[in-house]
Each structure stands twice: as structure tokens, then as C-alpha cells.
Amino acid sequence: AVGYILCAADYRGFVHCYRTTYLRRVLRTAPDQAAGLLGYLWCLGKIKNRPVHFHLDILPPYQRQGWGTRLMDTLCRHLRELGVDYLSCCGVSRDSAGYKMYRKYGFTESYDYGHNTVSLSLRL
């Protein structure tokens, strides 16, 4: 494996599961991690108008070799087939390699959280 891409095409279902299952489990088992997870939930609320959310991670030895673009191409093609109009990711640092890759791919900033962190969206 070179990395992965995860996508929640059902925003409401994802947020519901995040709140009722994942967040509750983490609060019981690792309460010190709750602040970051609650912050993430707040970030998700800022992209409700562009609700298809994803996460991409490429292992360091495979970065800058086109794998991220290939995974994005596959995901975008699949989402278009489902009739999805927008794809979003939240909590991206403007200083990150991911930010540069997403911008090159065509993503635009859709929300500024401050502290050099934004949500990015792509019209499919």
C-alpha cells in the first residue's frame, strides 16, 4: 500500500456516526483526546454547504510521485457517477504539502478557521 483515501459521501450519516459512536467511544477510553475531536466536529459544521468530506494520506516514501493525484482522480470519478457536486476537506494547514497538492488539483479555500488553517472545496 502507498496510502489511502477515505470519503464520506453521506455527510449527515458521517456526522451522526462521529457524534454517537466514535466521539463517545473516545470520550470513554481516551478523554484527553476529546478537545481535538470536538474541534474537528466544529470544523465539519463549517462545510455543511459542501458536505462530501474526505481524507487522503500517502506514505512518505511514495509522496510526490503522483499517487495522491491518482487516488483523487479515482475518487472524483466515482463521486461524479453518484451525482456529487462538491468535495471538501477541513482543517488543512496552508503550510502543509497537502495544501499545495490540493490547490494544484483545483481546490479553493471555502472557509478560513484562522491560525493558517482552512477548509478546501472542489467543484466536481
Where are these regions (language model features)?
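Feature marks short, surface-exposed loop/turn motifs that line or immediately flank catalytic pockets
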Residues: 9-13, 62, 95
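Residue-level recognition of the GNAT/N-acetyltransferase active site
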Residues: 55, 59, 92
